[in-house]
Amino acid sequence: MIASIRGVIQSIGNDYLIVETGGIGFLIYAPRSTLSAAGAVGSDIFLHTILIVREDALTLYGFSDNAQRSLFEQLIGVSGVGPKLALSLLSSGTPDEVRSMIAGGDVARLARVPGIGKKTAERIVLELRGKIDFRQLAASGSTSVSALDRELSEILVSLGYSAAEAAAAIASLPSDAPPTLEERLRLALRYFGSA
């Protein structure tokens, strides 16, 4: 398996880039966020990768961080979701946003991603919802979970929401959300349509 690659960008396409290392150019498919952060042709790049082996092809998929790669691995583990579909889903938002959609059971938003219909979106939620939790949502971000958000999560769980639903509601809070527990609770309940 090729777990990572470091090299020089030779070309950038709509859904791939070519990275040359050791005199070999590797075609690597990547989500939009990775492509937009890649830099210009001729610049150095480091990607976390997954090599998918099929009977007729060896295909590399590259990611800017481990959170994207981990989510990609979870997505391709879902029945009916292949690498291209998982890449399309990762291109629709950050790993936290995608996890929030799954944890919150937001089938409508998932189904709006190109290539994902309602049935596939439902299958993704069904198979991954219990595997996405608050710790995973928080761990993939660069900031730690505040004591306020931990308390908010406990309140939401005591109101009958699952830990995954609470995590999705908290992850959906805007970055400039008020620092008071009451206001954050109001915004979190609005996420569920309860406020």
Swiss-Prot record:
Q: Where are the residues of the annotated region Domain I?
A: 1-64
| Region called Flexible linker, residue ranges | 139-143
* Keyword annotations from UniProtKB, A to Z: Cytoplasm, DNA damage, DNA recombination, DNA repair, DNA-binding
Write out the ranges of the annotated region (Domain II): 65-139
Kindly indicate whether the keyword Transcription regulation belongs to this entry.
no
Task: Provide the transmembrane region boundaries.
Answer: none
Alphabetized InterPro entries for the sequence: DNA_helicase_Holl-junc_RuvA_I (IPR013849), Hlx-hairpin-Hlx_DNA-bd_motif (IPR003583), NA-bd_OB-fold (IPR012340), RuvA (IPR000085), RuvA_2-like (IPR010994), RuvA_C (IPR011114), RuvA_C_sf (IPR036267)
Q: Which Gene3D superfamilies match?
A: 5' to 3' exonuclease, C-terminal subdomain, DNA helicase RuvA subunit, C-terminal domain, Nucleic acid-binding proteins
Q: Which GO terms describe its biological process?
A: DNA recombination; DNA repair
Chief site of localization? cytoplasm
Region called Domain III, residue ranges: 144-195
Listed GO CC annotations: cytoplasm; Holliday junction helicase complex; Holliday junction resolvase complex
Superkingdom of origin organism: Bacteria
Alphabetized GO MF terms: ATP binding; four-way junction DNA binding; four-way junction helicase activity
Q: Where in the cell is it found?
A: Cytoplasm
The keyword Transmembrane is assigned to this record: no
Q: What is known of its domains?
A: Has three domains with a flexible linker between the domains II and III and assumes an 'L' shape. Domain III is highly mobile and contacts RuvB.
The UniProt subunit note reads as follows: Homotetramer. Forms an RuvA(8)-RuvB(12)-Holliday junction (HJ) complex. HJ DNA is sandwiched between 2 RuvA tetramers; dsDNA enters through RuvA and exits via RuvB. An RuvB hexamer assembles on each DNA strand where it exits the tetramer. Each RuvB hexamer is contacted by two RuvA subunits (via domain III) on 2 adjacent RuvB subunits; this complex drives branch migration. In the full resolvosome a probable DNA-RuvA(4)-RuvB(12)-RuvC(2) complex forms which resolves the HJ.
> What protein family does this chain belong to?
Belongs to the RuvA family.
Function noted in UniProt: The RuvA-RuvB-RuvC complex processes Holliday junction (HJ) DNA during genetic recombination and DNA repair, while the RuvA-RuvB complex plays an important role in the rescue of blocked DNA replication forks via replication fork reversal (RFR). RuvA specifically binds to HJ cruciform DNA, conferring on it an open structure. The RuvB hexamer acts as an ATP-dependent pump, pulling dsDNA into and through the RuvAB complex. HJ branch migration allows RuvC to scan DNA until it finds its consensus sequence, where it cleaves and resolves the cruciform DNA.
**What is the designated name of this protein?**
Holliday junction branch migration complex subunit RuvA
Q: From what organism does this protein derive?
A: Chloroflexus aggregans (strain MD-66 / DSM 9485)
